[in-house]
């Protein structure tokens, strides 16, 4: 070892070189330590001197190896500052510190044993010192101390004590870390054991429930079988009893007939029979004659016989054949007089309501005043209708959110249909028939617009079969409240929203894609009982010159006639982009016509209020876009409200996930839902739906080729690992840069206060 030097193999990295040096020194140290243990009983000072010298040589070997590593890998700052740039080498450097301490301890022990053999006190001389200096606690000295001069022993001892202290700290930190890892491992094993116990408990519970259900099913089948057998026995017993009674009656009659015939032929009657008297003297006084009796008679024949008897009685056909028996039959016929036929029931049919409007409170007061002047006879005749009115008012009061709806035509109040949110089939059919009749009336009296364009609007743009309610939309509480205040309440109670409280004529919903803007528009139309026009660019654009403008004009005309109505323009940025010099002439004409018709809504409302004192132009233009900054300035001015529809927050995502998984077989717990919700930060509503669909496909994929023969009930439920796998495929569709852009536009132009 004294003549050997550490050599670094080619293509070795810094970590590999340090590891090679450490393994060589570690093996040499183990051999010398074993030699000290084996020579402990021997007092040969020569052996201990060799061991002491070899340990010094080992320290010199380590020193030269570290210096060579520094030189080879050009470590200008030394190995002490290596951890700053290479934190992965901290462990090997700490191992060198601990190994240096072990070598010094072994050397001190060999020195002590050698001194005991010579009978002189040991000298704490050190020819070489392997340790780390002060500073960050990870700095190697440039040169290891060599030599054993007595004037430097004190300094060497102090330095060695400092190095030992650092090594002890490293040992203590490693011990604490190992204890911490051991504790974490034990805790993990305990958690696994608890989960295993819970799983076993659930399986046992499921098995017990299955066995109990199976046993109950067997008992039910057994009980039904016993009941069936009991019924069969009872039926057999009843049949046998009837047969026995019939047989007994037949034998008694036969014996009585035989007895009467024999008594007549002999002319002798027993004295016991003479003493017997019957209570029915009249019937028994005559001669007994047996006549064949019909055992059964059909109901139709009985009715025909009764009708025949009644007709004969009316015509007097029986008077010529009157006899004692005939008088008795007439009495029977008179006794059973047929009842007169019942009158047909009067079915009341409600008149068709053409258009529902709001009943004004002043009209109720006028009706109450006029009812006081009605004569008493008319009041008595109308008492029944008044009771119906009271009952219907009580029914209407059960729905505080819906106002009283009356017809625009002169229809009695008791015959006016109610529109409720539940939407029974009869009410929906009546509403659809009313809408159809209104459309026919409007098409018959079209003025100022093209009739064909109106028909195209009704066929392609009018939506009547989609019903979406507030409960179908998760979250977005602020947007719902703003829409209720700005649209729903004014449409349902226009008598309260007049003047400065007049409802807005334009509202813009903007935000990232997949946040539910289209569903909100449909929910507004449903909740406000409005006619819904869903407009897209393809429904208004035409290749013929001037046709697009006609369609726009017809759209607003039909919206006014079928008010209250909502014109919903999805992706409105495609139709109302900012105008420029390079724009096409046809698209500019469409924008101009759309803006003109839009501006006419406010003036049309004022004129209709002045003429008819009714609200016939409750029309709202509702737009949705993902690019609000691309809309023309004039169109943006007409949007009185601009609502930002953000991405769903934590609570909304949790509620949406639970609603998606409510009708799907799954084994998810509340903690699983919360974990999935945290993992889907930044997902939109459509992204969550796509994620749930992808997770629902995982149990199907596990079946593989067994899919065609698998039982649906035996397919496993959705687990949290399915969502983890789905997250590898489904990513969020909105970037943070896009969200920042939406928030900046909302703070600049949006209706933040609503």
Curated annotation (Swiss-Prot):
GO MF annotation terms: ATP binding; ATP hydrolysis activity
Pfam families named among the record's database cross-references: AAA (PF00004), AAA_lid_3 (PF17862), Vps4_C (PF09336)
Domain of life: Eukaryota
Modified residues (Phosphoserine): 255
Biological process (GO), any one: positive regulation of translation
GO cellular component: cell cortex; cytoplasm
Region annotation Disordered: where it falls in the sequence: 219-269, 317-439
Gene3D superfamilies from the UniProt entry: 1.10.8.60, P-loop containing nucleotide triphosphate hydrolases
Miscellaneous comment as given in the Swiss-Prot or TrEMBL entry: Present with 259 molecules/cell in log phase SD medium.
Protein's recorded name: Probable 26S proteasome subunit YTA6
Annotated organism of origin: Saccharomyces cerevisiae (strain ATCC 204508 / S288c)
């Amino acid at each position: 070892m004294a003549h050997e030097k550490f050599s670094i193999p080619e293509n070795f990295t810094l970590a590999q070189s340090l590891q090679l040096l450490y393994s060589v020194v570690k093996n040499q140290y183990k051999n010398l330590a074993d030699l000290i243990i084996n020579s402990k009983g021997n007092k040969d000072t020569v052996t201990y001197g060799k061991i002491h010298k070899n340990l010094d040589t080992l320290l010199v070997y380590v020193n030269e190896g570290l210096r060579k590593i520094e030189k080879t890998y050009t470590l200008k700052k030394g190995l002490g500052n290596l951890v700053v740039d290479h934190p992965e080498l901290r462990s090997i450097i700490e191992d060198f510190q601990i190994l240096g301490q072990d070598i010094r301890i072994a050397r001190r022990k060999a020195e002590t044993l050698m001194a005991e053999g010579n009978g002189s006190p040991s000298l704490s001389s050190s020819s070489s010192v392997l340790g780390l200096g002060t500073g960050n606690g990870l700095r190697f000295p440039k040169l290891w101390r060599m030599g054993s001069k007595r004037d430097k022993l004190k300094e060497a001892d102090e330095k060695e004590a400092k190095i030992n202290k650092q090594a002890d700290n490293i040992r203590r930190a490693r011990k604490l870390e190992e204890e911490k890892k051991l504790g974490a491992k034990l805790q993990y094993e305990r958690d696994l054991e608890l989960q295993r116990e819970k799983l076993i408990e659930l399986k046992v519970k499921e098995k017990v429930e299955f066995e109990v259900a199976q046993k109950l099913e067997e008992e039910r089948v057994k009980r039904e079988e016993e009941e069936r057998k009991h019924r069969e026995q009872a039926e057999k017993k009843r049949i046998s009893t009837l047969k026995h009674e019939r047989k007994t009656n037949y034998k008694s009659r036969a014996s009585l007939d035989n007895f009467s015939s024999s008594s007549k032929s002999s002319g002798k009657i027993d004295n016991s029979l003479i003493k017997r008297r019957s209570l029915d003297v009249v019937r028994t006084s005559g001669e007994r004659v047996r006549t064949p009796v019909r055992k059964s008679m059909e109901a139709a024949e009985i009715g025909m016989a009764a009708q025949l008897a009644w007709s004969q009685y009316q015509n007097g056909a029986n008077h010529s054949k009157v006899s004692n028996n005939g008088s008795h039959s007439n009495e029977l016929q008179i006794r059973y007089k047929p009842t007169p036929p019942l009158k047909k029931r009067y079915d009341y049919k409600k008149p068709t309501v053409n258009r529902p409007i709001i009943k004004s409170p002043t009209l109720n007061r006028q009706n109450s005043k006029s009812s006081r002047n009605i004569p008493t006879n008319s009041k008595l005749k109308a008492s029944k209708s008044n009771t119906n009115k009271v009952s219907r008012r009580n029914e209407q009061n059960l729905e505080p959110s819906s106002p009283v709806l009356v017809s625009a035509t002169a229809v009695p109040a008791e015959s006016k249909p109610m529109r409720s949110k539940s939407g029974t089939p009869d009410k929906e059919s009546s509403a659809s028939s009313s809408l159809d009749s209104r459309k026919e009336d409007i098409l018959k009296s079209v003025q100022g617009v093209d009739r064909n364009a109106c028909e195209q609007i009704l066929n392609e743009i009018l939506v009547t079969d989609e019903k979406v309610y507030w409960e179908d939309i998760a979250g977005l509480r602020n947007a719902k409240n703003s829409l209720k205040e700005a649209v729903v309440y004014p449409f349902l109670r226009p008598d309260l929203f007049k003047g400065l409280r007049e409802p807005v004529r334009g509202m813009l919903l903007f935000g990232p894609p997949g946040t539910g803007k289209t569903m909100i528009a449909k929910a507004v139309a449903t909740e406000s009982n409005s006619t819904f026009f869903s407009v897209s660019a393809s429904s208004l654009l035409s290749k013929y010159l001037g046709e697009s403008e006609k369609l726009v004009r017809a759209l607003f005309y039909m919206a006014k006639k079928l008010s209250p109505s909502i014109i919903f323009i999805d992706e409105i940025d495609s139709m109302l982009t900012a105008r420029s010099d390079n724009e096409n002439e046809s698209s500019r004409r469409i924008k101009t016509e759309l803006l003109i018709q839009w501006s006419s809504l406010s003036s049309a409302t004022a004129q209709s209020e002045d003429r008819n004192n009714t609200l016939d132009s409750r029309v709202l233009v509702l737009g949705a876009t993902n690019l609000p900054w691309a809309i023309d300035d004039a169109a943006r001015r007409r949007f009185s409200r601009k609502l930002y529809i953000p991405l769903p927050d934590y609570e909304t995502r949790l509620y949406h996930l639970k609603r998606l998984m409510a009708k799907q077989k799954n084994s998810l717990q509340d903690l699983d839902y919360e974990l999935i919700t945290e993992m889907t930060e930044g997902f939109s509503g459509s992204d969550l739906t796509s994620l749930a669909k992808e997770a629902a496909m995982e149990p199907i994929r596990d079946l593989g080729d067994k899919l065609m023969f698998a039982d649906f009930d035996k397919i496993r439920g959705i687990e949290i690992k399915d969502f983890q796998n789905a997250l590898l495929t489904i990513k969020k569709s909105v970037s943070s840069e896009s969200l920042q852009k939406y928030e900046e536009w909302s703070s600049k132009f949006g209706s933040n206060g609503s």
